Amino acid sequence: MSLSVTEGYIAFSHVLTEDQYQGQDVGYNVTLCMDTEEAAKLSALDVIVKDYQGVAQRKFKSGYSIDVLDDNGQAMSMTEELPRGTKVRVQWKHGNIHPQHGLATYANRIKVLEMGTGDIPLAFENAEETTDF
């Protein structure tokens, strides 16, 4: 079993409750936004990284609830999902390579580096400046 670590910011968190698709539970997951360096590391492993408005994103899935640790490595007692923009490291297991989706990424655990406030720092870095905002 090969493990890797990827650092980024939470875009979507489903670590306490299962994600839903068309009314069905589809498992636990976390979607990270990441910088180009982290995205390049994943791409080098044959992981498909999506681009959303100029920001690299990848979903890490699990069939089980995902352990969340604080920056000291201690288990966090959580009552709600991780907020958008939380800076984390995801330890993940390499799955099989799929011809369309690339290397499968299975979340093992998450280490919180800095709690988010709802914004993703990377989201506006690549945006063009406009006065119409």
Provide a role label for each language-model segment.
Residues 34-36, 94-96, 114:
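Beta-strand elements of well-folded, non-transmembrane domains
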Residues 50-74:
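Extended, solvent-exposed segments with strong compositional bias
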Residues 28-30, 90, 108:
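Hydrophobic residues positioned within well-ordered beta-strands of beta-sheet architectures
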Residues 41-45, 102-103, 122:
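A short secondary-structure junction signal
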Residues 72-88, 94-104:
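Exposed beta-sheet edge/beta-hairpin loop segments within beta-rich domains
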Residues 1-59:
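OB-fold ssDNA-binding interfaces and closely related basic DNA-contact patches used
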Residues 1-3, 116-133:
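Acidic, gly/ser/pro-rich intrinsically disordered tails
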Residues 98-118:
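OB-fold/S1-family single-stranded nucleic acid-binding modules
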